[in-house]
Amino acid sequence: YHARPLRSSENAMPPETKADEVAARVHDKAQYLAILRHNTQLLQRSVAHVEQRYTARVVRSLPYMRRHAQAWADVLALLVNETFKGAHREELLVHLPPPYKPVSAAEEPQPEAMDEEASTAPAADEAFPEVLAYVRLLVVVYLLSQPSSLAQATSLCSKAVDDVVQQNRRSLDILGAKLVYFLTRCYELNKDDKLSSLRDRLLALQRTASLRHDSETNATVQKALRRMYRVQDNL
């Protein structure tokens, strides 16, 4: 007995409706927003408990954030709107599209990574430098996804690195190292300046990191210097 072959119309899956596509997109954005909010809570907890592992968890999610930075930049704008006021809000929103408007609070899913300690996170102002550094980092990542925004990314990242160095908080070490990495990336992508024009600043950052026993930034700067010496033959 041979089974009757299915017709092509029977094999084909029913096409996804436009409404389903919109619903899926809304769900993805809501999930992205929930992860962003959770990450800010982790940063606050990192300061409250003096535990760098919470910041490390936030940084580990950066590849996912980076993949969707351009498509969901309006979600990041909503986080900026919720988190900051005054000059910092204006500084960040000028680089982003209009904020995303959730359909309803009930439709915003919570990420599975949420744990019971989320409710014990301190007030936002206690972790403000860490949250600001993280959101600036995300905005820089978004700007780097657009070649025409390289100058804006460089300016914002440079300012963020300066603020991290000036604040001298150990809870900022991991985020500061990431900002230094993306600052070097900005210069590498610049056809005029290149990484060699950042050499003096990198050497200054290395000295500061060594004095503060900031191993994260020190390692990042050393890698950038070695890359500059090898690739650009700038000694």
Locations of the language-model features?
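Extended alpha-helical scaffold regions
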Residues: 2-235
